[in-house]
Amino acid sequence: MSKLLSMRDAIAGLVPDGASIALGLQLEQMIPFAAGHELIRQKKRNLTLIGPISDILFDQMIGAGCVEKVIAAWVGNVMMGSAYNFRRAVEEDGMKVINLTNFTVALALQAAAMGVPFLPTKTALGSDTVRDNEFFVEIESPFPSFGSHGKSSSGDRSPTRPGGPRGRSSDKLHAVRALTPDVTIVHVQRADREGNAHCWGNFGVMIEGVRAAKRVIAVAEEIVEPEVIASDPNRTVIPGFLVNAVVECPFGAHPSPVQGYYKRDDVFFRQCHEQTKTRQDTAAWLDRWVYGVTDRKAYMNQLGGCRVDELGVKQHAYAAQADFGY
């Protein structure tokens, strides 16, 4: 069954006001800017944004008044530093922020994907991240303490039940609470009409975010025939049965890069930073690049054909051919 929708219909039908949305999960590449801009155009409100280190899309949505809460490791412009709208929202407007790390964002999403209430970790021990943070609870390991080579402190590899000869381990851990987004939005290189998607490059926490979510929107550079997807099952990192809508949107991740399609637009990132220093600046930027364009095609026309061509990948680096015969 075809799940192909326009961006407008996908956002209108699957993202209500008040939803929690995971996006920008592939770190600095394949950020779904076109989807974020459609959320802004539709004036979605009271959203919770979920992500690891989160580039300027979060800041744009905050500046547009869409966001009530952020759950992330960092928000800003990775080229230029702190994000102006994010800082204003926190310092002046009291926007709620839950601070996680890249790894604990991954653990929280993976726990939800597995259907368990939490996953344990040692990485947050001693960190201020856990202070007054609803996503962390310090717990004691129910198993014997193990050293760096998988041996217990006595050198015995055999497991011991709590209360056994060596008693309960004194190892401290943090339980990281499961995080289930209402919607995960991802950008991929290609997909078929049923939502089966090929993606390559840096996955970040995309796979965890897709599997954890209640609903998934996959935005693709191009829609291809099912035979293309079936030809390389190892690249089908998003199966169609997890996807609620698939949207074809060339250049939909600009100004972030998409491997094999176009480069990162460093000039655009710098300009956005310089042009959003105040609320008035941000409003003018949004009027030009979001409200002033009806869709991604109009956005690309405003960007200009020469700029689009300049950003296209010129030096391709193809992977070796894989033989699935047996």
Please report, for each region that a protein language model flagged, where it lies by residue.
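Conserved alpha/beta enzyme-core scaffold
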Residues: 1-151, 164-326
